Every structure is written in structure tokens, then in C-alpha cells.
UniProtKB/Swiss-Prot annotation:
GO biological process, any: translation
A GO molecular-function descriptor: structural constituent of ribosome
Name recorded for this polypeptide: Small ribosomal subunit protein uS17
Record lineage: Bacteria, Bacillati, Bacillota, Bacilli, Bacillales
Keyword field contains Transmembrane: no
Quaternary assembly: Part of the 30S ribosomal subunit.
GO CC annotation terms, alphabetical: cytosolic small ribosomal subunit
Amino acid sequence: MERNQRKVYTGRVVSDKMDKTITVLVETYKKDRLYGKRVKYSKKFKAHDENNSAKIGDIVRIQETRPLSKDKHFRLVEIVEEAVII
């Protein structure tokens, strides 16, 4: 699979407690087959963060990669928006 054909998702970091790993919540919409209403659903992905640069609440872009561990199949591409700490 070529590098440009790999899946790219944008989501919010919900956990950064692991070393060099973040958990990203990706929210998408599906259209209900019967009623046509848009239904929001979410999925969590573990992604490799080499420099531990992403923090909780950041909006990040992740890309599919080779399996790095049992659960980790994505890597951090960029931090789109940093979280505002109040």
C-alpha cells in the first residue's frame, strides 16, 4: 500500500498517559438507512507520538502505518490545534 493511500483521520486527544502513545477520539457521521437522519458515532485509535508532543484536548491528524504494537496502527502526523488551558 502506498503512503498516500493510507487512511488519515483528524481527532481529539483523550489520553496521553502512555509513553510515546496517544489515544485519539475520531468522530464521524453516518446516515441512517431507514430514516435518513445523520447519526454521530466515534472510535478511539492509539497512535504513535515519538516526541510526546501532543497533550489532552489537542486536535491532531493521524495516519495509518504498519503495526507498531498489538493496538497501535497509526502515527501522529501533525498537531492541527493545541488545547486551550483555562
